[in-house]
Amino acid sequence: MEYHPDLENLDEDGYTQLHFDSRSNTRIAVVSEKGSCVASPPWRLIAVILGILCLVILVIAVVLGTMAIWRPNSGRNSLENGYFPSRNKENHSQPTQSPLEESVTPTKAVKTTGVLSSPCPPNWIIYEKSCYLFSPSLNSWDQSKRQCSQLGSNLIKIDSSKELGFIVKQVSSQPDNSFWIGLSRPQTEVPWLWEDGSTFSSNLFQIRTTATQENPSPNCVWIHVSVIYDQLCSVPSCSICEKKFSM
């Protein structure tokens, strides 16, 4: 069988022209394009990772910046609080009291030149309208009386049960000592008298006797802890001086 070329397919030189189907070429191109999408690198994942890293770095930078600002302020505050007195503490601080002073009811102090000051000498205790000195010196009753007089005071005169409670509370803290008070009598047969000459009333407290055959005339009075006794006036003992003042 002889091949007869189609004259329409001959070119100028007499060669036959070949025509391929364009649809197959298009299909190949599409497939290759789709294949390139599947085989493309994971750039989206890389972009997400880089974004997260940037966010973490930003958060760290903010935290470090906040700490850098806070530390100088806190250091300055600690210096002010640690080495300089607080004005609030100066305004609201109150003077401390000794245990002996805390056990009594405080009284109003006298104002002098705008400053509160005590109306009592040092080592004396204020109670109500009097100053009290619990002297540790061991003297006879007469010697204790003279000592109080030299200090511008007298051996204590107990006028009320409230004052008695105050005295008992003070001397109870010194259970090894007894204290002379301003109560005596010239002889056993006469009533007890205070230093100012007033008569003692047994309604206030009772005086326990220490009279014996060897010591029949204890004509002075002292207090030991919470009990009041008569005693020989010559026995050395501590004493309580009292000085009254006007408010």
Curated annotation (Swiss-Prot):
Compartments in which it is found: Cell membrane
Signal peptide: none
Annotated binding of a divalent metal cation, by residue: 157, 159, 163, 242
UniProt topological domain (Extracellular) ranges: 66-247
Keywords tagged on the record: Cell membrane, Disulfide bond, Glycoprotein, Immunity, Inflammatory response, Innate immunity, Lectin, Membrane, Metal-binding, Phosphoprotein, Signal-anchor, Transmembrane, Transmembrane helix
Source organism superkingdom: Eukaryota
Binding site for (1,3-beta-D-glucosyl)n: 146-153, 195
SMART domains hit by this protein: CLECT
Post-translational modification: Phosphorylated on tyrosine residues in response to beta-glucan binding.
Tissue specificity field: Detected in dendritic cells, in paracortical and medullary regions of lymph nodes, and in spleen red pulp and white pulp.
Compositionally skewed regions (Polar residues) per UniProt: 93-105
Glycosylated residues in this chain: 91
Domain (C-type lectin) ranges: 127-242
A Gene Ontology BP annotation from the UniProt entry: positive regulation of T-helper 17 type immune response
Side of membrane Cytoplasmic, spans: 1-44
GO MF entries: (1->3)-beta-D-glucan binding; metal ion binding; pattern recognition receptor activity
Transmembrane segments: 45-65
Predominant location category: membrane
Bilayer topology term: Single-pass type II membrane protein
Chain segments carrying region Disordered: 81-105
Function: Lectin that functions as a pattern recognizing receptor (PRR) specific for beta-1,3-linked and beta-1,6-linked glucans, which constitute cell wall constituents from pathogenic bacteria and fungi.
PANTHER family xrefs: C-TYPE LECTIN DOMAIN FAMILY 7 MEMBER A (PTHR47218:SF1)
Quaternary organization: Homodimer. Interacts with SYK; participates in leukocyte activation in presence of fungal pathogens. Interacts with CD37; this interaction controls CLEC7A-mediated IL-6 production.
Protein's recorded name: C-type lectin domain family 7 member A
Classification lineage: Eukaryota, Metazoa, Chordata, Craniata, Vertebrata
